[in-house]
A protein has these predicted regions:
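Extracytoplasmic/periplasmic solute-binding protein
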Residues: 121-124, 154-205
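Hinge/lid segment of periplasmic solute-binding proteins
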Residues: 79-130, 154, 160, 181, ...
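A structural signal for short loop-to-beta-strand junctions that line the ligand-binding cleft
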Residues: 64, 72, 76, 99-138, ...
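Conserved C-terminal helix/tail region of periplasmic/extracytoplasmic solute-binding proteins
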Residues: 140, 351-403
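Glycine-centered hinge/linker elements that transmit conformational signals in sensory
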Residues: 202-233
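Long, aromatic- and glycine/proline-rich binding clefts that accommodate carbohydrate-like moieties
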Residues: 109, 275-276, 325-374
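Extracytoplasmic/periplasmic substrate-recognition and gating elements
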Residues: 40, 67, 142, 264-328, ...
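Conserved N-terminal structural module of periplasmic/extracytoplasmic solute-binding proteins
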Residues: 3-88, 100, 104, 268, ...
């Protein structure tokens, strides 16, 4: 059932019916379909989307916001740990609050990743989880099953390598995929054991360099030594790994199920599953990172535009949510009647969430994007031989305390 709309703002010269949207290329099919559905009942409003890759999109958004030329509707990121995260954008005065909207009552009161000074500043559509994305059929043919204990990762990688198919795709050239291993392992080794770890960091009571974060980087180094990855991770892009994964040339990748629609487009015959990435020898204590992901904000310059507000409310409607979860995958961030998981991977993530065996993406708690930037550059540097596990953690500490 479509949520009803209550518009705010006044008709003025700013009420242009020509709107622009800044979107993530991963979500293009869903956003295009959402715009089409919106236009079915709002034929007089034209929305022109422009799509970017994650890293390129972050840079373009910041350049355009600084120049005053950014789109009216911005696909952003929850929390404050990325340059395009809603809290960082709100703090810098780039986006407007979204108070008393039809969908806002469904945002959990304890979810601070969408709030700035207590006020909601983003429309959440889907949540995701980080884990090993793979095809059971492809693994069955290889005679392998995903590891559930850390010690099994080595034997899994060696067995996969012996068959000529790397176990894990590593698209480090794209940037953001470098964070996935650390997010997955520290969910278990750090945050499940000490949920207040980040708060203690800001109080200078602990640090990345003095914690299991260093071990997580050492584990990633070990995976490289064991032959877990394809050749030249720093020269491999996300698009290249998608093609290799769909063709069975790599067995899986540690990341988000948002890759699944692209994999289905490349290989419609496969079903894609999810396995938690182990960090210890006790599978029962494994946590996964899981939190809101696809989120939209409204440019402050467009905040008085009733048409922009109308579209923002549509993004929070059941119609738009159904389209997003069906075409992009993910778990509805707002309750959606009749929801059925779009893949086995999503069902697996929901099972972890139902058991409480998850921790939010940690960058949602970081107060500045420089921490994540130090992490990305650090992992790329480690694979280039210019950084060590300890030096990455130290540079992340420096970024946290400086910003």
């Amino acid at each position: 059932m479509l949520l009803s709309f209550s518009l705010i703002g006044s008709a003025n010269a700013g009420n242009s019916n020509e709107l622009r949207l800044h979107g993530n290329s991963t979500n293009k099919p869903a956003i295009d379909a959402i715009i089409k559905a919106f236009n079915a009942t709002n034929p007089g409003i034209r929305i022109t989307p422009t799509y970017y890759g994650v890293s390129d999109g972050q840079a373009a958004m910041m350049t355009q916001l600084l120049a005053g030329t950014a789109a009216d509707i911005l696909q952003a990121y929850p929390g404050s740990g990325a340059v395009n995260s809603v809290i960082a954008l709100a703090e810098n005065g780039y986006i407007a609050p979204l108070t008393y909207r039809p969908w806002s009552k469904f945002v959990a009161k304890n979810d601070q990743s969408l709030r700035y000074k207590g006020t909601i500043v983003g429309v959440p559509q889907t949540a995701q989880g980080v884990g090993y994305i793979y095809s059971k059929n492809i693994l069955k043919k290889a005679g392998l099953t995903p590891p559930t204990k850390w010690s099994e990762v080595k034997t899994y990688c060696q067995a996969a390598k012996a068959k000529g198919t790397p176990a894990y795709g590593a698209p480090w050239a794209t940037g953001w995929p470098t964070i996935m291993h650390s997010y997955a392992t520290t969910a278990t080794m750090v945050y499940a054991k000490d949920p207040d770890f980040t708060e203690k960091q800001y109080k200078k009571q602990t640090s990345f360099a003095g914690s299991a974060w260093v071990k997580s980087f050492e584990m990633l180094q070990d995976m490289n030594t064991w032959g877990c990855f394809q050749a030249s991770p720093n020269s491999t892009t996300y698009a290249m790994i998608q093609e290799q994964l769909a063709a069975g040339k790599v067995l899986g990748w540690l990341g988000l199920p948002t890759v699944i629609p692209a994999l289905k487009a490349l290989n419609a015959s496969e079903e894609w599953s999810f396995a938690a990435h182990p960090a210890t020898e006790n599978a029962a204590e494994t946590f996964i990172p899981s939190a809101n992901l696809v989120t939209f904000a409204i440019n402050k310059k467009a905040s008085s535009n009733v048409f922009a507000r109308r579209f923002m409310d549509f993004l929070g409607s059941s119609t738009a949510l159904e389209i997003q979860v069906r075409l992009s995958g993910g778990i509805p961030s707002i309750p959606l009647a009749g929801y059925v998981p779009t893949s086995p991977a999503i069902s697996d993530i929901m099972a972890y969430r139902a058991k409480g065996k998850f921790f939010p993406f940690i960058d949602h708690q970081w107060k500045a994007p420089q921490i994540q930037q130090a992490l990305i550059a650090g992992v790329q540097g480690m694979f280039a031989g210019t950084e060590t596990p300890k030096s990455i953690a130290e540079k992340m500490d420096e970024a946290l305390l400086k910003n």
